[in-house]
Structure formats: structure tokens, C-alpha cells
């Protein structure tokens, strides 16, 4: 069953509210095995809502409209559906009962315009709405299924789950199980990931969808099958192929983060960590300590923002700072070594860079970051050049530092 969704409301187009119904609808239809191919947002205009319905019914088997079922003049979804299908609006006893019951239960007077909510296109059935005055609308017409649902999420969500989805079972909704698995990737950009899996992106079942985030790329593998085991098997086969190509960059799955994965390895191997930060201002330590149980492996951190602090607390040589500058591979290495020795850990990480917006030069532009890691005396330095605002550069710096830690742990512990 192929579906399209139309969300009505000028306030969404103006950015005054966020359309959370779209995400909820997508998840629920996917779980029910219904393919949602298109979502559109339309303002509170009769002509445009009708046009959206006309366009959708030429392509889809199921057309869902959210919003526009209230009592005011700009609530136009019932009128638009009736006009699109050439049907009259008639009063529905069940819809009228929904309105009157709502006001009676709250001992509030009902104004006459509320009875507009009892009007349905001829042949439609009302869907009960215990959370509001507007009944939903369910209509089969000329081989298509139409559903009108209220816009407020507290009404939309229960009506979708409790009223609409059960009604769709006789109309060919697939009862397949949908299983998704997410692969988490770092250390390589979105273009590099897509190049590695471009021949797999057109797979129909399972599907493969990349998504880029700052310092990370995710690959979502989604399979449909008659059972959970069969769906898992399909994604597992695809995952094997992807890992053969990108295994050096896949650090986790599903809800894993770099800080949770590296933390688990540190704890399992009884290794300890300390960090020295300059441009990130403590963000790396913050992320590491967000993980429950991090006190088992994280012993401490320092924010050495000034050159004087780097010399005093980390033992960075003044001559190195004078000759190479604070943002240099030599200083990153010295920071990692200094914090490891000062705190007494197995591993030390040092971060130094230019987060901006000022402070950059042609030789050392904004976004230049050096990351150092000292693993029991073995030092490695990584150079990065990030783009974006100050907060984004700081985040990507910590992401790269955690990836460097993950990679070092893999190399040392294999």
C-alpha cells in the first residue's frame, strides 16, 4: 500500500510550530508495512489543499490529511476533500456525538460553529476522538482510501494508532516486519562513505540510507520480511558487505557513540585516560564523563588555554611554543604526553587548535586542529581542518579525538 501525507497549517510554513506529526506518522506507517512516499505541507487555503489531494490521489492508494478539522473558518480539510471528490458534505451522527460529548463532559457551552465538525463527505465514516472535538474521517472512494486526522499531536497520535491503522488492515496493508540497523562511522567523510557503497544504495530490500552529521556518518539498513528473524538476516548479509569495505571506520551500531564505545573498551581492558584541552575548553572531558561508569577509566582532565598553563601544568617547553606556536603537532604531542604523566594514566590526549571566528591566519586558518594521543609512551598526532561555526569546530575536534582514541585502542588491543 502506497501512501502520501498532507499536513495543513500556515503556522508550519511560517516556522511557528514544528511538524512532529510527520515523524510519528512515518514511524507508525513503516511499522505497519505501509510505504510512505511523499509528505507535503500546505497552508490553510481551500484551493491549495484541494490541489494537494488531487495530486496525491493520482499517485497513492492511501491519502492522509492532518489538520484542518476544527470549527473555525480556516479549518478546511473536510471541504477540500469533498470538493476534490465531488461529494456533498452531510452531517454524521457519530461525529456530532463526538462534539457534544466533549463539551458536555467538560460542562462547557458549545457554540454553533462547533457543529461544523460533524460534517463529513458523503459515504465517509467518523473516527472517534476522545481527546478533542473533531472526529476523524475515513473514506473509501473509487479504489482509494482517504483519512482526515486532527492536527494537535495529542489527538493525532492516538487516532492514528487506535482508529486509522486497524481500519487499514482490510485494504491491503502489509503485515510485514520492518527491521532497521544503523552503522556508525567516523574518520571518513560522507562522500567517501557513499563512494564505498554507491552500488548498494539502489537496493530495494534491504534499503541503505546514509546520513551525515558533524564528525560522523550513519548508514541505516532497513529490511522487510514476514518475520523478525528473516528481516534481521537480510540486514546482516548487507552489513557483512559494508563492513568488508568500511570496517576500519565503523565504530558502532544503533545507539552507540564514540564516547560509549571507547569507554567500554577502556573499562574492559582496565586502561585509564586523561585529557588536556585548549580550543575545546573541556568538551572532550564532558563527553567522556557523560557515560555512566566513566570514573572507572577517566582519571582527570585539564583545560590549558594559555601558553603559560601549558608550560606550568603539562610541561610543554617554552622553546617549542615560541618556535612552533601553540597550534602545532609538537604542542599537541607534548600536551598528550604531559597530561598522561601528570595524572598517571595509560593514555593521554591533547587537543590544540583555532576554533574561531578570529585568530586564524593564512598559515594557520580557523578550524585548524592538532590532536595528540600518547598510549604508554607511543605518540601519534593527527591534523584536522574543520569548517563551520565555533561550536561546530569544537564538537568535530572532540569527535576526531575520540575516533583517534578508538583507532588506537583497536590497534593496541588486537
Curated annotation (Swiss-Prot):
UniProt superkingdom: Bacteria
Positions in coiled-coil regions: none
Family as reported in the entry's similarity comment: Belongs to the CinA family.
Protein's name according to its UniProt entry: Putative competence-damage inducible protein
Matches recorded under InterPro entries: CinA (IPR050101), CinA-like_C (IPR036653), CinA_C (IPR008136), CinA_KH (IPR041424), Competence-induced_CinA (IPR008135), MoaB/Mog-like_dom_sf (IPR036425), MoaB/Mog_dom (IPR001453)
Gene3D superfamilies (UniProt xref): 3.30.70.2860, CinA-like, MoaB/Mog-like domain
Any single Pfam family the record assigns to this protein: MoCF_biosynth
